[in-house]
Amino acid sequence: MSVALRQVKANGVELNVALAGEGPAVLLLHGFPHTWQLWTHVLDGLAGRYRVIAPDLRGCGASARTAGGYDAGTLAADAEALLDALGETSAAVVGIDAGTPPAFLLAMRRPDLVRRLVVMESLVGRLPGAEEFLADGAPWWFGFHAEPGLAESVLTGHEDRYIDWFLDAGTLGQGVDPAVRDAFVHAYTGTEALRCSFSYYRALPESSRQIQEAVRTARLTVPTMAIGAHPVGSALEQQLRPVTDHLSGHVMENCGHIIPLHRPDRLLALLEPFLAPAGSTGSRGQLQHHGRRQ
């Protein structure tokens, strides 16, 4: 598989974008602490049928490090502008972790643009449904990352050990390919790189407000798939079900948070029939099953 890297200006920001394949567009939005290489093991499976668009999100990897704009609404605008810059008028959108809230808001705002939505291993703001997951509070690093300047001052010079912890925990101890690991460590090394990544957490109150406002005035009409693993499980599906017209939910057993690197084959088995354009075999049947364990 051939992957082309391009710098694309979108919403006023230079984004580093990996492009592969031809066909209907599939936009992949990574989370923390990732870059476009998060999708390394699923690109082959998707690029045979789709034009895969995998950016480094604003402030991450080789994309521009901006002073602000890390709220879900601005990130959704980045994604919309990226599709427009690449000449796409319709796309399936797949988000994981920090990529989920902007993917959700893009689908809410532009159901004419987003033909399928897949969201994984995240919560969408403070929508009801995640009470059990949050019973003991949010994961410890949320508060650590949210305090301005704190995490950067503690972690600068120790980024590799910190990233390794997330990669190990996110694959249930399996770890990731050394080349991918090294790419992530490089992308998140340095005080400014850390500031940008932690700005996602510092923007969570605004992102939550944007999500609450979106569901107050509209429903999610785009066919949607919610995929959970460890630790989020079915919490995302439970949040989405009251506000979504067409939703399928899946929880992957024995799978860590970083689904595309830990269980790429199982992820592809879910994505391939769901992402199929309207009229293709299996494109609609996926919406009839709820809470399926994988």
Regions inferred by a protein language model and the residue ranges of each:
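Catalytic histidine-centered segment of alpha/beta-hydrolase-like enzymes
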Residues: 255-268
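Alpha-helical elements of the RecA-like P-loop NTPase motor core of helicases
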Residues: 36-40, 195, 269
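Conserved HGGG/HGGXW glycine-rich cap/lid loop of the alpha/beta-hydrolase fold
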Residues: 16-62
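Proline-centered flexible-loop/turn and helix-kink motifs
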Residues: 33, 48, 111-112, 245, ...
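Actinobacteria-biased recognition of intrinsically disordered, low-complexity terminal regions
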Residues: 1-2, 280-294
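Flexible "cap/lid" subdomain of the alpha/beta-hydrolase fold that forms the substrate-access gate
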Residues: 2-6, 13-15, 25, 53, ...
